[in-house]
Amino acid sequence: MKKYLCTALALTLATACQEAPAPESPAPIVGPATAARIDSLLQDFVNNEQVAGISALVYEKGQEAYFGAYGYSDRDNGVPMARNTLVQIYSMTKPLTGTALMTLYETGAFNLDDPLTKYAPEFENMQVYTGVDADGKMLLEPVKRPISIRDIARHTAGFPNRPDIPGLSEALAAADPLNRENTLEEMAAKFGALPLWFQPGAQWEYGPSVDVQAFMVERISGQPYRDYLQQHVLDPLGMQETRYYVPEEDRGRFSAMYRLDPEAGTLTQLPDSTAKIEQLHHWPLARGGWGLTASLNDYMRFARMLLGKGTLEGVQVLRPETVELMATNHLPDSVTERSWLPGKGQVGFGIDFAVRVAPPASAEENNGVVGEFFWDGAASTLFWVDPHNDLAAVLFVQLFPYDPIKLHKKFRDAVYGPYTQTAQPGSK
């Protein structure tokens, strides 16, 4: 009897297991409706003559989920915006520089809280600006602590960067450390001879810190920065079209630059002779903070590596724990002066990325997900990595001034859908 009862119980359990519904997979963020919404948005930007050309690429759960390109990369000559169009990525150069720096971190070459002076005596005995006297002479005090590598990674070093600091801005202009004829070593020596604008670690201020990161890569590795970046980041990722210099044979697909006057509603194509001067010549200075060009596919390979916790298609560029470190907020609450960073939303700052630390507080803020990390460029380009939804997005355009039409917010809304106060995009 026991045998039959056991058999019956086993059959009942097996039937119940077979009939139990499989767990429901989360719906993708980018389905047909989302793709149509993105298409409509990008087309509207072109139709309304707010941009000449625009393209976007989204990967989700390891697959291409969206690609679209609209308008012209060169409106005057009728060249369409395409997947292989080359654009100036400006400050989206910075995360690539940070990645190069962190490959050295992984070898034990430095610690984040090491002082710069451990590797670069150019930054010894620095003074800090406190104002000017009645005669306009700068007033200075000693640094309370040395600049650390963490400071240059999160923009708290104190390097001057603005044209409106009495006395200090004039000294910065005279030293001209970012002149493209300088080498990185000459640049560092000139910054080291200038006063800092504020005490290291006291506030967040966007500036030349990532250019100093490039110098540190060169100093610690013993290789020219361009070569190190190529060997340790670009080549392993197959980013063959991410370069400081665009050769003659590729210039036909190198996008023109445009300037929008939102009030007048006019979109002007800028002369290549000025807009592309950085990329049409070989200059001594390889800036870590900007200067690279890239194709949409190339930059997505970088974003996918980050989404893959440091690995793309079996090639490891960074360890998972290093990517996590870079995508962690490194700004303590004591750093309350943060310039325009709060305009990016509920964010802190990691190692060359903004890091979302809270959901959007209102529909007016940029949409996004806690844990995402991102950055953008002066010509209105954008990328982000969303580990929560296993999603990465890249938006390419060449538009000055920086995002005058809220295209970043609108693109994020198109990807994630309307803002809701109760749930993050992709949450159940």
Where are these regions (language model features)?
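A generic structural motif
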Residues: 71-73, 274, 399
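Short, surface-exposed loop or secondary-structure junction motifs
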Residues: 126-367
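Short, surface-exposed beta-strand/loop micro-motifs that present aromatic residues
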Residues: 372, 379-389
